[in-house]
């Protein structure tokens, strides 16, 4: 029989304990503001999740979801070269299906590029690019008071960072 470890028994370097000590962590947030109301909600949720652990968010804006992966790659590289690297990244945006195949390209290629970047660079990255059928679906997923996908994306990035630190791949600041 496999037993589940209680939180009190968790080692000090477990992802949970590291997640609780992320003060000073620098999180890069790149948002596409194609739909301002949705972008506002996604960003509010992400900021709240980042600030809840004492981390710092640095926000950059791009025109659309396809530009997000390139912007993250550019900004991560710039941060390393400037001596102030980011510890994690969050992608925020929204793609709503229209009448053409453009949706499939934007949704698929942005997700693929983010995954490729995350895996190749060992980058803790939360994907908060919504891919939905309608504006109503987008608003429900974006609203902090509803599904809070912006907050969820930030929490995913922070959780991956905690795992990376627990594996001793990146020192805590």
UniProtKB/Swiss-Prot annotation:
Any one GO BP annotation for this protein: riboflavin biosynthetic process
Catalytic activity of the protein: (2S)-2-hydroxy-3-oxobutyl phosphate + 5-amino-6-(D-ribitylamino)uracil = 6,7-dimethyl-8-(1-D-ribityl)lumazine + phosphate + 2 H2O + H(+)
Active site annotation, chain numbering: 102
EC number: 2.5.1.78
Pathway note: Cofactor biosynthesis; riboflavin biosynthesis; riboflavin from 2-hydroxy-3-oxobutyl phosphate and 5-amino-6-(D-ribitylamino)uracil: step 1/2
InterPro entries per record: LS, LS/RS, LS/RS_sf
Keyword list, A-Z: Riboflavin biosynthesis, Transferase
Positions with a binding annotation for (2S)-2-hydroxy-3-oxobutyl phosphate: 99-100, 141
Pfam families attached to this UniProt entry: DMRL_synthase
Binding site for 5-amino-6-(D-ribitylamino)uracil: 34, 65-67, 94-96, 127
GO CC terms: cytosol; riboflavin synthase complex
GO molecular function: 6,7-dimethyl-8-ribityllumazine synthase activity
Superkingdom, taxonomy of origin: Bacteria
Family: Belongs to the DMRL synthase family.
Function: Catalyzes the formation of 6,7-dimethyl-8-ribityllumazine by condensation of 5-amino-6-(D-ribitylamino)uracil with 3,4-dihydroxy-2-butanone 4-phosphate. This is the penultimate step in the biosynthesis of riboflavin.
Cited PANTHER family: 6,7-DIMETHYL-8-RIBITYLLUMAZINE SYNTHASE (PTHR21058:SF0), 6,7-DIMETHYL-8-RIBITYLLUMAZINE SYNTHASE DMRL SYNTHASE LUMAZINE SYNTHASE (PTHR21058)
Record protein name field: 6,7-dimethyl-8-ribityllumazine synthase
Annotated gene: ribH
């Amino acid at each position: 029989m496999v037993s589940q470890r209680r939180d009190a028994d968790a080692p000090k370097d477990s992802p949970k304990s590291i997640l609780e000590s992320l003060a000073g962590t620098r999180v890069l947030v790149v948002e596409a503001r194609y739909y301002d109301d949705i972008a506002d909600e996604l960003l509010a949720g992400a900021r709240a999740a980042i600030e809840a652990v004492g981390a710092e968010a640095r926000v950059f804006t791009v025109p659309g979801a396809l530009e997000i992966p390139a912007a993250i790659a550019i900004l991560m590289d710039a941060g390393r070269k400037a001596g102030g690297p980011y510890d994690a990244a969050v992608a925020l945006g929204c793609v709503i299906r229209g009448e053409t195949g453009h949706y499939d390209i934007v949704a698929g290629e942005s997700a693929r590029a983010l995954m490729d970047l995350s895996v190749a660079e060992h980058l803790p990255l939360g994907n908060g690019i919504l891919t939905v059928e309608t504006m109503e679906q987008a608003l429900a997923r974006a609203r902090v008071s509803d599904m809070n996908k912006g907050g969820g994306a930030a929490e995913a990035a922070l959780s991956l960072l905690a795992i990376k630190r627990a594996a001793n791949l990146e020192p805590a600041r």
